[in-house]
C-alpha cells in the first residue's frame, strides 16, 4: 500500500549515490538563497553550483547526525507501531526531483506512513548539541531554527 502511494507522487526517484546536486536546488539551498542559513553565503552557493567551489565536506555534526538517523527511525518504530517508518535507499530511492519543477530536489530522512489513516508524511531528522539546543523549542513545540 505505502509503496503504491510513493510511486504516485509527482516526483522522479533517484539514488543518492551519483546524484549531481549542482543541477537543482534542495531545501538547504533554499535557506541559503533566502539568507537565513548562517553556515553558507548565497555567493558561495552560486559558485558551488557553477563548479567554481568544491562541494562542502561533511563535518562532525553532519556526520553524527547521519549516524544517529537509523537509531532515531528505530525508536520511532518502537514508539509508534501503527506507523511504518521508511528508510532512504532501503525502502525508496533517496533523492526525489519534482516532475513539475525539475530543478527542485529533496532527500528526506524518511517517510512516515500511518497504517490507520493511510496518510504519508515526510520525516526530517535533526539532532542538536547542547550548545545549539536553545535554538529549538521544548519537545512537541513548533519552534525550530529559521533555516529549517
What are these regions (language model features)?
Residues 1-71:
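Charged, glycine-rich intrinsically disordered N-terminal tails and low-complexity linkers that flank
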Residues 55, 62, 72-73, 79-148:
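Mg2+/Mn2+-dependent nuclease catalytic core
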